Amino acid sequence: MVFISYNTFGAGNKSPARTSQKGWIHVLDGCTPWPDELAARYRASGHWRGETFDRLLRAWARAHPHRTALVHRERRLSYAGLEAAADRVARRLAGLGIAAGDRVVLQLPNIPEFFAVFFALQRLGAVPVLALPLHRRSEIVHLCRLSEAVAYVVPDVHQGFDHRELAAEALKEAPGLRHVLVVGDPGPHTPLDGPGTDVPAGPDDPSDVALLLVSGGTTGLPKLIPRTHDDYAYNVRASAETCRFGPDTVYLAALPVAHNFALGCPGVLGALHAGGTAVLTDEPDPDAAFALMERERVTATALVPPTARIWAAATEWAEADLTALRLLQVGGARLLPEHAQQVRDAFGPVLQQVFGMAEGLLNYTEPDAPQDVVLHTQGRPLSLDDEIRVVDEHDRDVPPGTTGRLLTRGPYTLRGYYRADEHNATAFTADGYYRTGDLVRRTPTGHLVVEGRVKEQINRGGDKVAAAEVEEQLAHHPAVLDTAVVPVPDDLLGERTCAFVVPRPGATAPGRNEAAAFLRERGLAPYKVPDRIETLDALPVTAVGKTDKKALTELARKLAAGGSARKEGNPRS
Ligand code: OOB
């Protein structure tokens, strides 16, 4: 086993794929490793323990084979059963020629097969690219091409959407894609179930990339976030410890498990790491979720703020017994103090705020934190080795307690997006800090309060929408000359999207329905379709001639409150 497989490369540099004598790819081409001295520090402090996810699953299955690992509807899978399922899928994939270093786009909802495939890929040393269930052609084709995926794993039909049709388009548009594997009725594709071949011993290097997470993004299409075994195993283990997960933990995954929060913060992997049970569902409405929580005696779950508020309201009339619940994590978007209070009033002192990101850094309010901290802050960094800087626009530290831009680096925060040299040059400082794009303030106790953001991203109740991506897509509409997408405040989701559109001379700008149909047709995920469309004769510009997003955000706010675009803000009317 090669313990230290990374060479030292600066942020933004490409590291070459390294091939061992046996032909395994050790470091994915296009990933930026941690510098040697930091890697050594993270190992010395016991954060990085040289674990791989394949060895972890085997160790769990050996330690308690008969305990329940996963529950889905009426199905219960023991740890031994999960390991056997992963082995079966690994044999299947090996039979198709999927091998160490290959990337596989995994787009499955919250079903046990997600984890069977995830761990099968770990077995093979192949790398899952975790697409969200709501991603559509635009995102999927991009993810397949960017990762040069050889396979794409989908359900047959999920929530009325036929993934086999999307897969057929992906096969046409992503040249490297060789296999589509379907859970359920395969249609023209390959069933995930089926015969396979022996699995060759895979690579066993903890500093290899274990998975690629998809970023919420701020520019154009989503980016890929390489997470190594060392860093993600630490992410999971430290989160499980902080959240006091143990063998009696019953974690309900109601958010998509392809998202970092429900996967590893501590999520399903945290529950498994602790020897507990994970219950999978994608029905987060309170009727279904509460019934499941009562049935399974769920002790912990994670929600985005809008769902947390809906659940809090539902406790007024719901009769389910939720007394087993000890931890209710809320994160992904800002939870206002008054909403935090509502959640706390409804569920008792089980609320935990989580401020995290797929890129790494996680902040949790501690389970025994004073109520004031839980209501008013978004938590404290998970690791003693998380380095935090709060800076102004020139990267100068702001005085303590002042709001500024959050920069971070640490043992589980990426050093570069996958194959994104140009973006990496600005997304990181020269000394490797990730520019989160979030505006925060640090309290004297070291807790962070998220005050806003500098990045152009709309946070639609936890679903991240990159303004640039929607703008790019809308610009393809034949009647659209120019466009700018901004957030509008929304009581439930926190924010919704508003697209300002300037029509081409003589053309009529598309209305909301037409724009929505157009964007869906182009394969954009449905949650990225603008909630509002407003027409302008021209976009306002700043002194240097850039689109004035500040003015547009203000205008969108006024319009949402009942004004008119032409009266209030169109500079040329
Ligand atoms: C989580 O991850 P992502 O990658 O979908 O989104 C990260 C961004 C952050 O940069 C921040 O802008 C926002 O989402 N965010 C919050 C927040 N938690 C995330 N903004 C305000 N308050 C919070 N509590 O969203 C994520 C990943 C792991 C755990 C939890 C959330």
Which residues make up each language-model segment?
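Structural core segment of the AMP-binding/adenylate-forming
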Residues: 6-27, 95-96, 126-190, 505
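Conserved AMP-binding/adenylate-forming core of the ANL superfamily
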Residues: 47-50, 54, 58, 66-97, ...
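Conserved pre-ATP/AMP-binding loop-to-beta segment of ANL
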Residues: 50, 65-66, 196-216, 221, ...
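AMP-binding/adenylate-forming catalytic core of the ANL superfamily
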Residues: 91, 135-142, 152-154, 301, ...
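Conserved AMP-binding/adenylation subdomain of ANL enzymes
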Residues: 233-250, 260-300, 314
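Gly/Ser/Thr-rich phosphate-binding loop
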Residues: 298-302, 312-373, 387
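Conserved ATP/PPi-binding loop(s) of AMP-dependent carboxylate-activating enzymes
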Residues: 381-385, 396-427, 465
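AMP-binding/adenylate-forming catalytic domain of the ANL superfamily
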Residues: 524-546, 570-572
